[in-house]
Amino acid sequence: MDKISVNKLVEEVKSNLPREIIVSIAQSCLNENTDSQTTIKNFENELYKYTLNVQKKVINCTGTLLHTNLGRAQTDINFTGGSTNIEYDILNNRRGKRNEFLNQSMNLLLGSEDVCFVNNNASSLYITLKTLKNIYGKKSVIISRGEIIEIGGSYRLPEIIQETDLKMVEIGTTNKTKITDYEKALKENEDSLILKVHRSNFSINGFVEEVNLKDLKSLTESHNSILIHDLGSGLVASRKFLEKENIDIFDDEPTVQESLRQGADLVMFSGDKLFGSLQSGIIAGDKEMIQSIKESPLFRTYRCSPLTLFELQETTNKYVSKNEIEIPLWKMIAMNYEELENRIKSITENLKIKHEVVHDNSVMGGGTLPNKFIASPVIQISELENTNLMSKLIHNEIPIIPRINKNNIIIDLSLIHI
């Protein structure tokens, strides 16, 4: 059988992959004991797959702002590496408190007594419940059946609660939960807490009823209980800013600040959704409870990296200084239809491929605002008439990721941060 060597395969390849990986791919293909032509073809295909799988910057033209598979919120990362005073008191030249400035500025933004940061919002919920069980002696979690959620990636709320060793007490029905349901559960389950979950990735309409945070707070106070609000999506942008920028799709979306004002002892939310920063979980509220979470043995296993904390600090500062529009997510959302049309025109003026500019809608994605859309003009190109276009887009120096709809390549420019 005509064979080819590893060196021969590797020498003829132009790739940015480390040589050791290329050699490994070549050896794997040679071990299949095929003829030279087949080996070369298999090697090229495997190398192609590896190259596409390398984590890299891409251009999101899908029309989904918080695309979970593309990293959710786009950010301006200004941290260039090196050492950082993440836990250092520069003034006194000694060890200091971890991310002290971020804590202060986030409390100022949210109106919270204290705050802490973990690596994602699932961790926020888990470490909160575990701490309230271990430190505060809670034995069960009371939750409405209409709020027992599942989100992308097979995250199911009951499974998280089960891992905390707390008993989950389901109350009400899918569409209706009343204050009397909570009251009955509190009486029947000693040392319980109430968990209210924001249905950020689906909605229930019609014959529905739920209990607001103010009424739940009054109830927990009279029963020596605790009220937790898992907001998930985590809107913190001010109503004044949204009104100024004519953004009305968030009119029915609760903000973190509103949840705290209405009485939630602890509120948790994601940093990479409507907050517009990097993947993280943010827990805000009662100082004593937050301190207990920070002192938990679990906290070190879930805490954020210096890069994440730096970016959270940068994003928080923009909110505090009323410069929300500088946050890439809000800059994209606030862009008006005419601006997008002009952006498309500047690109399509010299575009030789047959195309159409059509009306479409962008969506938030990331498990947020399931029934809301943002009007957006898009470039539509027939995939059937341009069979090589998709390959050219994904093989661009910075891969361009469009979406496919009914054999059309759709390029939405509203998500390109300039």
Model-derived segments and spans:
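Conserved small/polar residues in nucleotide/adenosyl-binding loops
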Residues: I416-I418
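Long amphipathic N-terminal alpha/beta scaffold segment
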Residues: S36-T75, Q104
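Conserved C-terminal alpha-helix-loop-beta "cap" of PLP-dependent enzymes
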Residues: E341-L413
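Long amphipathic alpha-helical segments
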Residues: M1-Y48
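Conserved PLP-enzyme active-site core in the AAT-like
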Residues: N93-T316, T348
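Conserved PLP-dependent catalytic core of the aminotransferase class-I/II
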Residues: I143-S144, P306-L309, Q313-G365
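Short Gly/Ser/Thr- and Asp/Glu-enriched loop/turn motifs at secondary-structure junctions
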Residues: I4, I59-G63, A122, L274-L278, ...
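Glycine-rich phosphate-binding segment of PLP-dependent enzymes
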Residues: A26-Q27, N31, C61-T62, G71-N93
